Amino acid sequence: XXKLVESGXXLVQPGGSLRLSKXYTENVNHPATTTXYKXQPMTPDFTEXQTHEGTHQDVFDQPNLXXWKGNTLPEGYEPAKXGEXGTQDANPKXXQDGDEXTXTGXXQXDKIGRYNLXPTIFFEATPPKANENQ
């Protein structure tokens, strides 16, 4: 039929959010075209109204908990102090083994349980085959 979802919109399923990946492109005339989706788990802190603010992939790629609208930092975390080398915007008050140097950016296996960035699950939807008469 038509597009599965409009660009930028999110499909929310129980226990998670389903969203178009950044690299989403489509050629509706090509029968082999597949559309990739990224899914991220919902955290208990998000309400229905906060879903679209908090679960976009680029937010997970660049963790910036302080900038999430309508959210407060989870218990045990505080904003990074200016001048600290290699810190994120939310740092554990007590350091854990292997947490000393955490680089911001790409999917890292962090120890923030509710904000675990990995793994990323890809959902693929295959569009209907093109009409042979076209």
Curated annotation (Swiss-Prot):
Basic and acidic residues bias locations: 50-59
GO biological process, one term: D-xylose metabolic process
Enzyme Commission number(s): 1.1.1.9
Keyword terms, alphabetized: Carbohydrate metabolism, Metal-binding, NAD, Oxidoreductase, Xylose metabolism, Zinc
Annotated source species: Sus scrofa (Pig)
Lineage: Eukaryota, Metazoa, Chordata, Craniata, Vertebrata
Family from the record: Belongs to the zinc-containing alcohol dehydrogenase family.
Activity regulation summary: Activated by calcium and inhibited by zinc.
Disordered, as annotated region: 31-115
Recorded GO MF terms: D-xylulose reductase activity; metal ion binding
Keyword Oxidoreductase included in the entry's annotation: yes
Catalytic activity from the UniProt record: xylitol + NAD(+) = D-xylulose + NADH + H(+)
Class of this enzyme: oxidoreductase
Keyword Metal-binding carried by entry: yes
Name of the protein this chain belongs to: D-xylulose reductase
